[in-house]
């Protein structure tokens, strides 16, 4: 199943590449690197805001492990929907896990709330 492979690749990427800073890898570059390893080595380049309209993903109401979480200008990969956890490349942390249900990634401190969840369409 692609979703599980996407989630595992993201988690492994975080473990091995957690020292990569945002200046070295933008959020879309992280997601693309994971998708290219887990799904398709020729996955096309997309900016964060291109993912929802790319035709490669379906919007879903309830995310599952391996789905994408999108904000205006930002994208990440859902790792644990029960804990509202995603992995992305953030300005403050580089490639790391964070929560999309509290703090900055849920609208606190001037941050943005997720606007959609996306599931890869095989």
Segments the model singles out, each with a brief description of its role:
Residues 1-55, 72-73, 87:
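N-terminal capping segments
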Residues 15-19, 49-51, 55-58, 79-122:
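Aromatic- and glycine-rich peptidoglycan recognition patches
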Residues 61-62:
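Residue "hotspots" at secondary-structure boundaries inside conserved domains
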Residues 65-66:
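Loop/turn positions that initiate beta-strands
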């Amino acid at each position: 199943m692609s979703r599980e492979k996407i989630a595992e690749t993201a988690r492994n990427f975080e473990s091995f590449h957690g020292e990569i800073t945002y200046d070295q890898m933008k959020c879309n570059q992280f997601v693309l690197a994971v998708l290219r390893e887990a799904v398709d080595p020729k996955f096309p380049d997309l900016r964060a805001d291109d993912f929802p309209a790319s035709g490669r993903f379906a919007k879903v109401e309830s995310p599952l492990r391996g789905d994408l979480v999108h904000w205006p200008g930002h994208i990440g990969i859902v790792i644990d929907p029960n804990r509202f956890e995603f992995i992305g490349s953030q300005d403050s942390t580089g490639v790391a896990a964070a929560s999309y249900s509290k703090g900055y990634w849920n609208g606190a401190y001037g941050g943005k709330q997720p606007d959609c969840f996306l599931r890869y369409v095989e």
